[in-house]
Amino acid sequence: MSGRSSRRGSFSLRQPPVVDIGCNCRRPKLFSIFSSSSSSSFRRGGSKPKSPNASSTSTTTAFTATTGGAGTATSTDSSWGPASFTTNSLFEEPAAAQQEQEQLETRRRRRQQRRRRRRAGATSFARGGDVGGHDDEQQQLQEQAPYRRVAKESVAVAVESAEPYEDFRESMVQMVVEKEIYAWDDLNDLLHQFLSLNSPRHHPLILHAFADLWTRNGLFSPPSPCQF
């Protein structure tokens, strides 16, 4: 009798361990734009303040402006300082994004060429068959040669992010400052690249970030040459 009571007393109740594995959700992907030097100078530090316009879980994909070849950008930290890009993982998709970008540029060039030909034909007809329209077209092409340098110097990068608004805004700041993008044609090209590479559901965040930099920060104004 005493043996049974001692065996019963030796048993103790144990609670089964509980492991939280999370929701196992996958974040969507976005696109942004970066300069070549900014992509290699990510700073590690405290997390950025959350914006009320940022979505809870989303992912950005960036445009990285490069002067040489595009290398794979990787990271193991979950946050950087306030002046850097906040992501959980960063990886490049140069093949698909570059091909899509080239197709967009080809279509845009064809539309512009058709418009110029129609205008040149109308001008030459009004002048009685003047053949100077070709020279005007060549001059317009030379004047617009610096245009669309944002697209030419950029590489699309897919990035996972929890704060897409802040990431879009930070990417715009880096491109404008490091590439000195102050002409309206270049700024319009910058905005168009963000909109064309991202899903329409992210367009309000992109437009909001662009308008915020335009109206509040004065970032798109060229720096004054005067030094006080």
Swiss-Prot record:
Induction: Induced by 24-epibrassinolide. Phosphorylated on serine and threonine residues by GSK2. Dephosphorylated during response to brassinosteroid. Residues 1-14, 54-79, 92-101 have a biased composition (Low complexity). Residues 1-21, 36-143 are annotated as: Disordered. Signal peptide: none annotated. Residues 107-120 have a biased composition (Basic residues). GO terms for cellular component: cytoplasm; nucleus. It is found in: Nucleus; Cytoplasm. The keyword Acetylation does not apply. Residues 157-216 form the OVATE domain. Keywords: Brassinosteroid signaling pathway, Cytoplasm, Nucleus, Repressor, Transcription, Transcription regulation. Its main location: nucleus. Expressed in roots, stems, stem nodes, young leaves, leaf sheaths, lamina joints, young spikelets, inflorescences, stamens and ovaries, embryos and seeds. Interacts with GSK2. The gain-of-function mutant ofp8 (T-DNA tagging) shows an enhanced lamina joint inclination at the maturation stage. Plants silencing OFP8 have a marked upright leaf phenotype and are insensitive to brassinolide. NCBIfam families: A_thal_3678. Probable transcriptional repressor that regulates multiple aspects of plant growth and development, partly through brassinosteroid (BR) signaling pathway. Acts downstream of the kinase GSK2, a negative regulator of BR signaling. This is Transcription repressor OFP8. It comes from Oryza sativa subsp. japonica (Rice).
